[in-house]
Amino acid sequence: MAKNIQAIRGMNDYLPADTAVWQRVEQILKQVLSSYGFSEIRMPIVEQTPLFKRAIGEVTDVVEKEMYTFDDRNGESLTLRPEGTAGCVRAGIEHGLLYNQEQRLWYIGPMFRYERPQKGRYRQFHQIGAEVFGLQGPDIDAELIMMTARWWKALGIADHVSLELNSIGSLEARANYRNALVAFLEQHIEVLDEDCKRRMYSNPLRVLDSKNPDIQALLNDAPALGDYLDDESREHFAGLCHQLDAAGIAYRVNQRLVRGLDYYNRTVFEWVTDSLGAQGTVCAGGRYDGLVEQLGGRATPAVGFAMGLERLVLLVQAVNPEFEPMRVVDVYVIASGDGVQSAAMLLAERLRDALPELKLMTNFGGGNFKKQFARADKWGARIALVLGEDEVANKQLVIKDLRNGEQQTLAQSDAAATLAALLQL
């Protein structure tokens, strides 16, 4: 017997019970994005490898260890996208969306990183991201954070996430800080692990977010990034904090927060949670004013964030037991008797014409009324429409609320209006 082919490790199937939750989560996220004036953009899953090397940075874990890279038949190096910002910027430059314009874009889809699979972290994962181009003040940074806070309230997880915030300054300020940090690390090189030694000269700021407790203890005496900020970055950060204070959004300034991608400057932030075990990041982003120019476009201020949907869904399921998944079926049509099935199908089509948003399923499995009602319950229907020979003859139907058992007989011509009222369509 041939061996069964299974999904690749770290790349998961999501079955109907899962996708009902995902669809409801995504619906909430998209509604909020729309309320802030964002438009969707869709980019390819595969991009030229140099895009990510130039954008993310060659001396990063993502580029060095985690990208799925291959040569096509023409010998061109291609990569499955590990994140969305670089592709969004590439598309904006290529199609003339960015220069001297304000753009608010969002995207959603699968990303790929070769990591050790664990809860909430997979080799194929899904992100939703938002990017704003053409605005350089701290107000838009604050509004993006305020928008994410609105997400948490809508999803019922606001009490289980907290905001960490930092400014990593301008490129020049970071260069000055980099020199001071390297000098400090050189004085304590015997304490550094191999990973930190490797990064000390190539990307020393990444030492700041080392998970090694000995390194974290050492960094208590290291130079503080905040002491090296340029005046403009300091003023920008103060403006951001002032706006968040005014909006009542709590935050903690974490001067070791630098983010893992090289393109950030000034504002960086993370929403974190400890409700899934060890503290994990739910949503992260920041400002990347130099990336558009770095990828060949005109200098354009930009700020954005991305969020992993797997971890978000896990968090919603863990802390919000009242969260309702997307309903697959609102109304289930039950029919019994000679010639009734055809009448039920035609009734269902008329109801779909009248109520395009209605989710309606007609029973095709036969069986007595008891079995058909059991199927309606299995599909999670809220309402059953019952047709028998008498109802067809009299152009009537029975409508039954499956939550409380109440039922009534009414004319078929009144069914659409009654369902619209009951389901608030």
UniProtKB/Swiss-Prot annotation:
Localization annotation: Cytoplasm
Swiss-Prot/TrEMBL keywords: Aminoacyl-tRNA synthetase, ATP-binding, Cytoplasm, Ligase, Nucleotide-binding, Protein biosynthesis
Gene Ontology biological process: histidyl-tRNA aminoacylation
Catalytic activity entry: tRNA(His) + L-histidine + ATP = L-histidyl-tRNA(His) + AMP + diphosphate + H(+)
Spans through the membrane: none
InterPro entries found in the cross-reference section: aa-tRNA-synth_II, aa-tRNA-synth_II/BPL/LPL, Anticodon-bd, Anticodon-bd_dom_sf, His-tRNA-ligase, HisRS-like_core, HisRS/HisZ, HisRS_anticodon
PANTHER family registered for this protein in UniProt: HISTIDINE--TRNA LIGASE, MITOCHONDRIAL-RELATED, HISTIDYL-TRNA SYNTHETASE
NCBIfam families: hisS
Subunit structure: Homodimer.
HAMAP family with a match to the protein in the record: His_tRNA_synth
Name listed for the protein in its UniProt record: Histidine--tRNA ligase
Gene name of this polypeptide: hisS
